[in-house]
Every structure is written in C-alpha cells, then in structure tokens.
C-alpha cells in the first residue's frame, strides 16, 4: 500500500507534510519531485520489486513523471507483447506503466492495454498536462480537492485536510 500525493503548484512543503502524515503507507522510503507546475510525492511499500527499483516519483526518458500505487496483473504478458520495444532496467511495474504512458494515450493504456488495480498521477512535462487515474472499482483510492491555486490530491483523504 504505497501512498501518492501531489499539488498543481511548486510547493514541496505541503507534500512533505502529507508524506509525513501518511508515512505508514510506505516504510521503504519517500521522495518528492517538484517543478513550477506540479509537486508530486510518494511513500514506497515495495512488494513485487526491490525497494531501490521502485523508487518514485518515476521520471521517464521523456522527462515525464509518474507516481503510482497498484499492480499490473498482466505485467508478464505485456513484457512479452512489447519485448521488441520495451527494454526494462528493473522488475518494477512502475517502469512499464511509465513507458506505456509515454508511448500511448492515457485512454489506450487504461482501456486496452493494462489489467490492473491502480491509482496514479502522470505529469506530461512537454504537454504540461496532468492525468489522475484510479481503477474503476476504487480499490486503490485517490482523493482530490480544488484549492485557490489548483488541485491537491492524495491516496488518503486525511492528506487533503490541514
């Protein structure tokens, strides 16, 4: 049960506070990505990969950034399907999801490629676009709220409460 958090502004202190409040969601580490447009944070609970492989926020080769909590059930099948295009450096499904989101539209990835339980936030730096997503059943929660300056989001509702 990882934790993902963010705000659509440069404000690392708010995300540090949320990470601290929700630290039990990920005892294997936490980290933050911050730009002028977005600040993303992550608490890591490593289950299927080594803790150093799953460190997030995950920055892709295209400079896009992903924070993710979940499991891709068809991970091994997708490794075979994309073996001529995707060359993983880890055993972490975060790396695969990041690559897929770099290559295909969000809708294509969610509707036609992955079979998963998830919540994630993907920041496309080039397009200056942020996508928030959770599985249709809400197994991996993602809460959000409007603020005076944008949107704040968290794996737990208490991350949104001051």
Predicted regions and their residues:
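Cysteine-centered catalytic environments shared across enzyme families
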Residues: 1-162
């Amino acid at each position: 049960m990882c934790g993902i958090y963010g705000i659509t502004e440069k404000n690392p202190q708010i995300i540090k506070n949320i990470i601290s409040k929700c630290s039990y969601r990920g005892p294997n580490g936490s980290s933050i990505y911050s730009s002028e447009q977005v600040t993303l944070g992550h608490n890591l609970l490593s289950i299927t990969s080594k803790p150093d492989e799953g460190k997030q926020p995950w920055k892709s080769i295209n400079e896009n950034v992903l924070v993710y909590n979940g499991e891709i059930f068809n991970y091994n099948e997708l490794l075979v399907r994309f073996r001529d295009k995707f060359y993983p450096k880890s055993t972490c499904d975060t790396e695969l999801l990041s690559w897929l989101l770099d290559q295909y539209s969000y809708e294509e990835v969610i509707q036609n490629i992955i079979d998963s339980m998830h919540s994630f936030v993907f920041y496309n730096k080039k397009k200056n676009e942020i996508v928030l997503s959770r599985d249709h059943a809400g197994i991996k929660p993602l809460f959000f709220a409007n603020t005076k300056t944008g949107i704040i989001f968290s794996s737990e509702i208490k991350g949104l409460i001051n």
